[in-house]
Amino acid sequence: MSDILNSAIAKVQSSRHAFCRFITANDTGKNGSHQAGFYIPKCAALLLFDKPGTKGENKSKLVKVKWQDDFFTDSRFIYYGQGTRNEYRITRFGKNFPFFEEENVGDLLIIAQESDDYYHGFVLQTDQEIDDFFAYFNLSPEMTNQLIDISQPISSEEQVHIRIQEVVSSYTDFPGTIQMAQLARDLYNN
């Protein structure tokens, strides 16, 4: 598992609310749409606000999002409830935001809420990462575009697997026999 995938799993597990969906051509603006930012369906409103928006009113809040454990955006969560619109969006990513490109269509967007105004964002780009994320949370592609059920307990086997991946990813060279035996003992005892 990649470091990004491991981090995405950990952040989703420890989050208040988490959400995932596939990035569309509308999101990237590459199909000529005038849409701004990532669309969030009404069923995931609690990811953005403590209570759903009220038709006839707009509401918004500013948040900090840490992307890929690397860089931040000062983004805006907005509910458009006036006129004919009735939708939620995440906007304000800055001009050089790397995930609004045509090649990002089909990537998996993950948003995890850490606090009222601090979030983690991840974009998984490979089929293997997406499949592993789905497998970990027992999801399928049809189960995206909604909040992720993080209440499911994690099996001890999955916990060991995650811990092994964390340890393995910290090495650049294969450890020696004595070091490997010590790591195995530590993993078993913890």
Predicted regions and their residues:
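OB-fold ssDNA-binding interfaces and closely related basic DNA-contact patches used
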Residues: 1-64
